[in-house]
Regions:
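Active-site beta->alpha N-cap acidic-glycine motif
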Residues: 17-112, 117-122, 130-136, 141-146, ...
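Short low-complexity, flexible loop/linker segments enriched in glycine and/or proline
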Residues: 126-129, 195-202, 323-325
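C-terminal regions of proteins
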Residues: 311-357
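Short acidic, glycine/proline-rich loop/turn micro-motifs
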Residues: 122-126, 235-237
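Aromatic-lined glycan-binding groove of carbohydrate-active enzymes
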Residues: 197-266
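Processing junctions and N-termini across compartments
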Residues: 9, 18, 23, 28-30, ...
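Cleavable N-terminal signal peptides of Sec/SRP-targeted secreted and luminal proteins
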Residues: 2-16
């Protein structure tokens, strides 16, 4: 009881330390470290001069089944400037194959965090305190770096499970853990024109669809808004596989046009980043949707002013906005690959549920299955 009381007092004290965010002052909130929440294009560029970024993301565990889809639809793609096309994986820990995560990283894709446990109920994420979020995400960063041999500084992003916002604590955890951006926060009010990425130094105009949303001034982390699509009935949907009124799932042409219509709202508007956010299973069970996505990516890869990129590359451009005429002449992103010595581990007893797990890792095996409070399984 005394421990619970002390933890409660810590949480209250922690919350009290964060100052309430004030209305954004554009004369003080300056790039590259600060940006007001706004639909204004960074750098004051005209829409025609803005590179249209396309962010393709996949959520959840990486395994021997879904890697086949990723290899099929993503590998070997290049943008029109000759640079490899990017994508971002928000990876949850349970049942993830870290040898395959290493493969994705070495292919140039971005690996970000989707929590250690991805557990239900959804209220767990709304109510999680700072300490829980450190175990779910900061510790997952250590786990990912260790078992997939990804440099710690290359793991930059977060997507909260179920897109359930958490108020201030998740962003404070990010600020303290060297994490750069969150890509969990949907908007249905700032779609056309779209809301550009911004920081939380000042109060946000972002609509709060899945409360609680942050209210404090938290310098450091960026928000990449999840700009909603419109389904065929005009209803908003944050992820492609959450749209309710969709074309028939076996109609490739209709799905291609559905994707293209949502893309063109950005492309012919203020060119805020366009997100194709999805879970792999939806493509696996709907081959026509997968074919439509491939067709759409082919289209984007042939546009001279649109680019499939990793999420962090969007932040880098917003911090230093340059016209597309200059962007296409920039050198391609460089990174150091990390050779993986694949090791199969198991059975590993899990201390949280008593089950046995197998793991595929890029170094020595853990003693037990990694979990909350023991991310390296020691």
């Amino acid at each position: 009881m005394r421990l619970i009381l002390l933890l409660s007092l810590f949480v209250v004290a922690f919350a009290a330390e964060l100052p309430l965010a004030e209305e954004c002052d554009e004369t003080k909130c300056l790039l590259p470290r600060c940006r007001c929440s706004s639909t204004n294009i960074p750098g004051g560029l005209a829409p025609r001069d803005v590179p249209q970024f396309v962010s393709v993301t996949f959520d959840d565990a990486v395994n021997v089944i879904n890697i086949e889809t990723y290899r099929e639809v993503l590998y070997g793609r290049s943008n029109s400037n000759g640079c490899p096309a990017g994508a971002t994986f928000y990876v949850s820990h349970e049942y993830t194959n870290y040898v395959l995560v290493n493969e994705l990283y070495n292919r140039g894709y971005e690996v970000s965090l989707h929590s250690m446990t991805h557990q239900t109920p959804q209220t767990y994420w709304a109510e999680a305190d700072y300490d829980v979020l450190v175990k779910e995400f900061a510790d997952q960063k250590s786990l990912m770096s260790h078992f997939a041999l990804i440099p710690d500084q290359e793991i930059r992003g977060v997507r909260l499970p179920f897109l359930q916002m958490n108020g201030n604590a998740s962003f404070q955890m990010m600020a303290d853990s060297g994490l750069v951006y969150d890509n969990s926060w949907p908007t249905v009010s700032h779609v056309n024109p779209g809301l550009w990425p911004y920081t939380l130094d000042y109060a946000s105009i972002h609509d709060c669809i899945v409360p609680p949303c942050p209210s404090a001034s938290i310098p450091g982390p960026w928000v990449i808004p999840m700009i909603s699509w419109s389904d065929l009935n005009g209803s908003p949907c944050s992820m492609a596989d959450s749209c309710y009124f969709t074309p028939p799932l076996d109609d490739e042409n209709a799905w291609y046009n559905f994707i293209l219509t949502n893309f063109e709202r950005h492309y012919h508007g203020n060119r805020a980043p366009f997100g194709f956010y999805i879970h792999e299973w939806y493509l696996a069970v709907n081959p026509a949707v997968k074919a439509a996505l491939v067709r759409f990516m082919n289209y984007v890869n042939n546009l001279n002013d649109a680019f499939m990129v990793n999420a962090n590359q969007i932040i880098e451009w917003v911090q230093n906005p340059i016209p597309v005429s200059e962007y296409i002449r920039r050198p391609c992103r460089r990174f150091s690959s990390t050779p993986c010595r694949a090791t199969s581990c198991g059975p590993l007893r899990s201390e949280h549920n008593g089950l046995d797990y197998w793991m595929q890792v890029c170094n020595t095996c853990p003693r037990v299955y990694p979990w909350l409070g023991n991310p390296l399984g020691r």
